[in-house]
Amino acid sequence: MTKPRVAVMIPTRMRAPEFRMALKSVRDTSSAYVIAYLDDDVDNSAYPEMGYIRIVGKRLGVVGALNVMARYVMENMPEIQLIAMMTDDSLMKSPGWDEMALRAAHRFSGGIGCVAPCTNKEGAHRVDQPAVTRGWLSYFGHFAHPDMNHYCWPSVIGLLADGICLRRCTSEEWYIHHDQKGGGDHHFDSDSRAFYRWIVAHMDQHREWLRNYIGFGVRHEDACRLS
């Protein structure tokens, strides 16, 4: 039996019922592995014991947890080609989304790219809860930008990949429903400042480096044609 080639990372804190639903939604729609990061300063006894890879550690915030899980994938799961994420209050809704995303990812030159699910059927298609290729992680060295804690990091990925190696999925191809149960996070101001600094000081150069590294062999329109 072929091993799954997609992993879904879920940072979660004190939301065992929501996590169970998120885990079930991944199982019901794909063959992807699930990896969860749980903070060790709270009671996690209500979380399921089986059916996913469980990492317990100190509270790091969303960005820190994602990067720990991404590093685990890179070091321990060589078969994984696409690394996705979702919040613990989200649900995967599109059967076969993992195979569709893999087909899209295979069209990126050098194995470097981002596949962005649709997370808002009515509004603008911003990059949120993105998936990146193994090559992307090898190139950048992290999943979420380490200067941020909770917010803005998906937009960093979107701005880096846009027009170079970004595939935006339709709601029919890959839709993630986000319940937005969070009450806000106190890192918004600091994350916004870090995001602005990155745009002003680094975005253009990082995009140029990425474009030169892959030789701009990635044609956005080709990535959108699935065969």
Give the positions of each predicted feature:
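A short, conserved alpha-helix in the catalytic core of glycosyltransferases
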Residues: 101, 136, 148-166
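Conserved donor-nucleotide/metal-binding helix-loop-beta segment in metal-dependent transferases, i.e.
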Residues: 95-114
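Short beta-strand-to-loop acidic/aromatic patch adjacent to the donor-nucleotide binding site
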Residues: 79-91
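Short, acidic, metal-binding catalytic loop of nucleotide-sugar glycosyltransferases
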Residues: 21-33
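C-terminal catalytic/acceptor-binding lobe
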Residues: 155-227
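N-proximal low-complexity "stem/linker" segments adjacent to membrane-targeting elements
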Residues: 1-24
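Short beta-strand-to-loop element that shapes/binds the nucleotide-sugar donor at the catalytic cleft/hinge
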Residues: 113-128
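Glycine-rich, basic loop-to-helix element that forms the pyrophosphate-binding segment
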Residues: 57-74
